[in-house]
Amino acid sequence: PEEEAFTALSNIESNNNAWMGTSVSGYVAVWDARAPTMEPQMRLTGPSKSPYLSVASNGMYVATGTELKGSDAMIDVWDLRQTSTPVHTYSEVHSDDITSLVFHPDRTQHANILLSGGMDGLICATDTSIKTEEDAVVSVGNTNASLARVGWAAYPTSYCFTPSVPVTDVDMDDHDQQLVNNERWHHLGPVYAISNMQTLSLWDADKFDCIKEGVEVRKPTSFRPPWVTDYVIDACASGPLSQRPAQGPSMHMYMGDQEGGMALVSAEAQDHDGIVMEWTMHARLPSTENHPKAHADIVRCVEWDEASRRLYTGGEDGRLLAWSFETSDSPVTPQGGMNTSTSSIETPPAKPARRPRPTGHDTLKRRYSPYA
């Protein structure tokens, strides 16, 4: 039923057998694969009852982002060991739907630092170990575009971090100075933001200085084999076919077209100033035009499983596909799934490049806004 529709899924890092999903009914459902029932083992109901749109896991802690309700959009932080109520709630970080959440990957140097993005165009770093919202916000940037995805980008060892100069201000008390000089708040590294208009921007998270903004991801068309992007399915710091360390702030994107085709593409800023962006195609996955078992419609989600070296994808055609990057492998069927199809990744015969499509929205199916 509509009231039970789920908006986001994620694994729980502290338990390889558990995963969670956020609901439009305003709760987080937690499942354990070892349980004999298909019912969730836990339901965490948010105090606002607002639909949850995004979720991220950090050990035993879970962060969830809500849809705008009235004038508030909230980030609830849950402790899975005491689930009666969130341990923290931040209601002023964003002023519109919170669409994307991700914790910093370095749990030692930057523990509990949460990156968030929303429809208000803001991209924020928040220290979720601090209860008081005014103290918890580390830095904020404005992309001037409604955001669909944010994340921590890859960067080389030579990356020029924002210099961390100890701050002393006569107007600050000891508490405030201790906060701004917190080592966990410095050298956070670069982040990426992808908008609903299919634009990419790169930022340094310490103060959200812009490295590169307003990059149209549908503009590059000189890929070989030929490929034209319609939308970004998802993004990550590094992809399964990365062959060399990043020379500048970079990230990988899973691109899609209207027919169900996909491509794994990386974008890298050539220097810290981000004047030049280098685009590289690492793989192209066919649609049903070239492979009968591939996707025939828009692809909504992707998940790379490093252990099995498989890429799982789901689309509007109702298919769940398991792809192998080893072209010699036989197709692999996802275990226990229903309505599934399989294929190995192959480079299809080159076909004439299609004319780039006009940007904008299809008013019938909103095909150019896959996150809507």
Where are these regions (language model features)?
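WD40 beta-propeller repeat blades
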Residues: 2-230
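Terminal intrinsically disordered, low-complexity extensions flanking WD-repeat/beta-propeller proteins
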Residues: 145-372
